[in-house]
Regions:
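Acidic/aromatic/glycine-rich contiguous surface patches that form carbohydrate-binding/processing clefts
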Residues: 244
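Extended intrinsically disordered or low-complexity regions, especially N/C-terminal cytosolic tails and loops
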Residues: 1-236, 248-342
Length: 342
């Protein structure tokens, strides 16, 4: 049983010096204690069954990366789920190489997600301004958004507050300050470069349908409703890439829509739901098929294949099938460029 109990007051009155107002009585899981680098290495060797061939190298890596990011982030791949120890033969170097592989994956995906982000920024600013004009008061006007439903109203109010923050006071962006100072106005095409992918995606989702349709027509075989779902997922993955979180096993609570590529790749289904390519890393690979032009997409897939092949050729601590399973990739994922989008 866990109970909150107030400490006894000293006879002289007042609260106990240096004590919390309440303490926990009963059986609890104690917070993990601090370990120095040598203790961390000993724990990995003796308690976690991890081979460490070069302790000096291991210590240097832990200084650069941190125990939590490296071991906490990548332990599940090579651990026995029953014993909570690493599988026999797993080395510290195996964990480090997996960490570096994921880092390279983040860099690759982020580079192409930024291309999508820039395209959405360009198109949203173009079609919004085409309809409403270049004065900043237009994108600060709630009537220029789809102001139906309480949720939309709250989201629009929050978005406009963000936009106002850029144009009503000095910012760190010289081009915004220059436009405001010289012209007394910051057109949307100037502002969008400072906005995050999340900001511009939210703006797209809150725009009237006619503007959404015009934007979506720049992407083959994707309608405005599908675009909303795709952008929601891509924003989440972009943030994972940008913030250095573990990417290759990441799953979102949101999903991209069922697209023709799912069917053409004959992705397995559980009931009516596709097993892969909905909220995992492969969902991004599929979404990029529709959101990038053909040249960029071919370059992306070429780089992705090379990165995966290099890792698998160099390391046998995880099989190709295991890696694909963790990433949400079907075995025939390499065929994705053979199929038309529709």
């Amino acid at each position: 049983m866990i109970a909150l109990q107030k400490p006894v007051r000293p006879a002289t009155g007042g609260e106990p010096a240096g004590a919390p107002l309440f303490y926990i009585r009963g059986m609890v899981h104690m917070q993990k204690i601090f370990l120095n680098y040598d203790q961390q290495i000993e724990k990995l060797k003796n308690e976690k069954n991890l081979l460490i061939n070069n302790e000096a190298y291991a210590k240097e890596i832990l200084k650069q990366t941190s125990y939590y990011s490296l071991i906490g982030g990548y332990k599940d791949i090579s651990k026995n789920p029953t014993t909570k120890k690493y599988k026999d033969g797993t080395s510290f170097e195996d964990i480090v190489e997996l960490y570096y592989f994921d880092e390279l994956l983040r860099q690759l995906f982020l580079r192409y997600l930024i291309k999508v982000e820039n395209g959405i920024k360009s198109q949203v600013s173009y079609y919004f301004t085409e309809k409403n004009g270049e004065n900043q008061k237009e994108y600060l006007d709630t009537s220029n958004y789809n102001y139906s439903g309480k949720k939309n109203q709250r989201d629009i109010d929050r978005l406009i507050k963000i936009l106002e923050g850029y144009v009503t006071k000095p910012t760190d962006y010289h081009y915004i300050n220059h436009s405001q100072k010289k012209y007394g106005n910051v057109p949307l095409w100037v502002l969008t470069n400072a906005l995050t992918f999340g900001n511009i995606s939210k703006m797209y989702m809150l725009l009237p349908q006619d503007i959404q349709i015009k934007v979506s027509r720049n992407y083959q075989c994707v309608n405005e409703k599908q675009m909303v779902s795709i952008l929601t997922v891509l924003v989440k993955f972009r943030n994972v890439c940008a913030h250095g979180e573990r990417l290759f096993t990441y799953r979102t609570a949101d999903s991209i829509p069922d697209l023709p590529i799912h069917r053409k790749l004959k992705i397995a289904q559980k009931g009516s739901q596709y097993v892969n390519g909905k909220n995992d890393l492969f969902s991004v690979v599929i979404a990029l098929r529709y959101m990038l032009n053909d040249q960029w997409y071919r370059e992306f897939i070429k780089e992705l294949k090379a990165l995966i092949d290099k890792y698998l050729k160099k390391h046998d601590s995880i099989s190709e099938q295991e890696l694909y399973e963790k990433m949400g990739f079907p075995e025939n994922w390499r065929k994705i460029t053979r199929y038309r989008k529709q």
